[in-house]
Structure formats: C-alpha cells, structure tokens
Amino acid sequence: MNMQQPNQPVMRFIADGMLGRLARWLRILGYDTTYEKVITDEALIERAVRENRRLLTRDRRLTLRKLLRDRHILIVSDDIEGQLHQLHRDLKIDLDLTHRQGYRCADCNVALTTISHNDAASLVPPFVAEQYQAFLQCAHCRRVFWPGTHWQDLTRRLTAIRARSLDTQP
C-alpha cells in the first residue's frame, strides 16, 4: 500500500440507495462518491446535476430522465465484482490501490490524510503500531487506516476483477 497522497481521481459519482456497497468501494479507490440510502429520485438527480456527478443506479426508470443526459450509468450486476468490472470496462476507472489515487474514508467520503507513526500509535492497537509504519486518517470520523490484511484482500479482489476485464476485451 502506497500511503503517499497522490492525485485524486477526477470522476465524481452519486450512488442510488441500492448501491451503498459500490459507493464504499469507490471511496476506497479514491473516487468522490456520495451516497444517501434514503433520497427521492428528484433530489438524487438534482444533486447529480448540481454537483456534476455521474449517477450510478440500478433503476432503469432513473436513466430515462432528461436532466441526466449522459451523466448516468445503469449498473446491471447485483454483485460488487460485476459492478466494479462494469465501471472498469465502461468508464476505465482505475482498480489499482497501489498507485495514483488518493484514498477516501469508506464511511464519510472525506479524503484521508497521512499521519505520523507517533500520532497513530496512540490511536491503534499496540500490535498494529509495532507492525506498520504508514497510517492514514479521516479528518471527519478520525478513523485510522493502515495496510493490513484487509488491504491485501481488497488488492487481491481488485486484481481478479482487472484480470476478468482483460479476459472480456475484444
């Protein structure tokens, strides 16, 4: 895990109430992705237009709204791997955690900032402070992140999705 704070991805998303899990993954990948579980279709569309975000939806009716024009993606898969594969294929989103992107809090959607090992040591379990040197923190919820086994699992899953994308290219 490269804990440097590289450039933020430019694409911004808003996910409808059926895509909370996808919103969390996109945030981890560094994409500014808003998500509200309960929001009217009108408010969702208005926010997408006002904030210049692409609407991610599983609702075919929403994609027919004129205000959205080309600012929407109809997500066809029910599973997260299929959803990420579709966005990688259709929008060329980067599914690599090791470079380029800044990272965002999966809960808050706030960009994470690097914190020193000394600052992190008082906020994480002692064995984590002993084992890891690089830490990021959310300025909003104060949650601390480090490149542990969960990060390795995410990386493996994303590598498999990228390989799947290569297998399905013409």
State where each predicted segment sits:
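Long, charged N-terminal interaction/targeting segments
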Residues: 1-100
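Extended interfacial segments that mediate partner engagement and assembly in macromolecular machines
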Residues: 9-29, 131-134, 147-166, 170
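Short glycine-/acidic-enriched loop or helix-start segments at secondary-structure transitions
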Residues: 65-67, 117, 150
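Flanking scaffold residues of small Cys/His-coordinated metal-binding clusters
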Residues: 99-103, 130-133
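SIR2/sirtuin NAD+-dependent deacylase catalytic core
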Residues: 102, 112, 121
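Short cysteine-rich clusters marking metal-coordination/redox-active sites
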Residues: 105-108, 138-141
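Short functional micro-motifs and their immediate structural scaffolds
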Residues: 110-117, 146
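Short linker/helix segments within small regulatory modules
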Residues: 122-135
